[in-house]
């Protein structure tokens, strides 16, 4: 198999904060992001609802005119970790040199429309994230799709089978011989930052793939990444630095080398 999938969470994995915190939350009158998230948590508890649905509901209630374009514009304010802007070009080029096609995917509990507005949106073969339904004028009216920490695993199987269309459940659930799988789990690398990524990490790692717990310079985040590695949820725990010659780059290049070597060995069977 000459393909490898690099699969990323978004918030605090490719970006140092939750995507709403850069501009959206201040724009609706909050001075502190934690106050917004507390309102979301309180709303979820009060209504006994999913936390992701709750934040989408609060965003819709607090913003006077939430549209597809408004959300996409929010993507322009999202900052990325060091090196992310050139990461894809470097890794793609290295994969090509080794005879490996690298595909990039997002599986995020954040908002698809905001991700689509970021500077790296075009780097991904597919973005799986939460989204709203819109009326004919483009106004958000209701959550259309949510991606919580357990639902994330569905999209790993979509990538595995090559059934990328979210509306195609028939082919996703149909039995597929291993030799017909689009990208085997052994050729996947999942990047995440915390406990909400554990189900996805377990699926990938238990099926022979690689998982990377990333952390920033904050002590608490570092400890969490190390805990994920200790508990064998993460194969690697690495600082969220995607720049040239960083540990993440060297690690992913090593994985690409391993896949390429395995492909060469398979030819002798």
Predicted feature descriptions by range:
Residues 1-136, 228, 234-235:
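Alpha-helical substrate-recognition element adjacent to the catalytic core
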């Amino acid at each position: 198999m000459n393909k490898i999938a690099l699969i990323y969470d978004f918030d605090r994995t490719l970006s140092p904060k939750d995507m709403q915190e850069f501009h959206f939350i201040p724009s609706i009158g909050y001075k502190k992001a934690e106050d917004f998230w507390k309102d979301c948590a309180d709303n979820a508890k009060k209504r006994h609802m999913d936390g992701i649905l709750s934040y989408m509901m609060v965003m819709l209630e607090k913003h006077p005119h939430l549209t597809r374009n408004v959300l996409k514009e929010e993507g322009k304010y999202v900052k990325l970790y060091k090196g992310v802007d050139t990461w894809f070009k470097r890794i793609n080029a290295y994969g090509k040199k080794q005879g490996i096609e690298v595909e990039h995917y997002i599986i995020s509990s954040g908002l698809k429309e905001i991700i689509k507005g970021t500077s790296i949106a075009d780097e991904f073969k597919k973005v799986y994230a939460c989204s709203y339904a819109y009326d004919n004028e483009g106004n958000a009216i209701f959550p259309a799709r949510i991606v919580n920490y357990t639902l994330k695993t569905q999209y790993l199987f979509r990538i595995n089978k090559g059934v990328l269309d979210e509306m195609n459940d028939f082919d996703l659930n149909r039995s597929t011989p291993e030799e017909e799988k689009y990208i085997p789990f052994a050729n996947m690398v999942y990047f995440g930052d915390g406990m909400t990524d554990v189900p996805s990490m377990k699926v990938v790692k238990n099926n022979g793939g690689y998982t990377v717990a990333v952390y920033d310079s904050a002590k608490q985040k570092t400890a969490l990444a190390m805990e994920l590695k200790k508990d064998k949820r993460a194969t690697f725990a690495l600082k969220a630095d995607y720049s040239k010659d960083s540990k993440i780059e060297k690690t992913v290049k090593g994985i690409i080398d391993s896949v390429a070597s395995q492909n060469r060995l398979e030819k002798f069977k």
